[in-house]
């Protein structure tokens, strides 16, 4: 469904993605783990076309969105086509990005009404159903500042689902939350995975990656170092860099008394 072929991305002299190739099948849950600065979030932003690429090709359902030609130029699809593709691959951010002056319901309805020009009543019915799905039926008239961080993140997930995307990208969506609020967000994500939603998840929640992912990718220094089924990555990683990372994470969690996620 989503395919990257030798994608490269730099910010100035810093190479953030180095010849990254990746194939994500429909209905697959792929979790991306790795240290800070590995290029994980940039990879998601390139898939969602929030960042351009320097070379390589990105495909959505076998249609190239960015492609690199022999003359050294990256050819980008039309902006209109990019917007259409962006609505098919929605992204949920670490910082929620809700509009503070709009109610929860208005935040969820905004893009389908104003970007896709869908009938308002139809969108309203869908938004109400989605807020029920994420456990927020009683908050539809609330404003973001009246919600906890976990509730705001669930609104952000409902907002992404309102565009009826073919895939969802999650960029460390629990990292800004208090520990006791993480579980409520992970429960929603587990439900989406069980329903067959295609998901690419950048996460530090190792329990979620181990239990929910079909495949885990370990990234470091802009490269996919290793990928495989969760059991193989977490119990028998092939690369020393992967082993070092997992050992560090597990030791840090043990010192902090962080329990395995129970979502």
Predicted regions and their residues:
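Conserved ABC ATPase signature
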Residues: 143-147, 151
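H-loop/switch region of ABC-family ATPase nucleotide-binding domains
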Residues: 203-204
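A short, proline-enriched helix->beta-strand linker immediately N-terminal to the Walker B motif
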Residues: 162-166
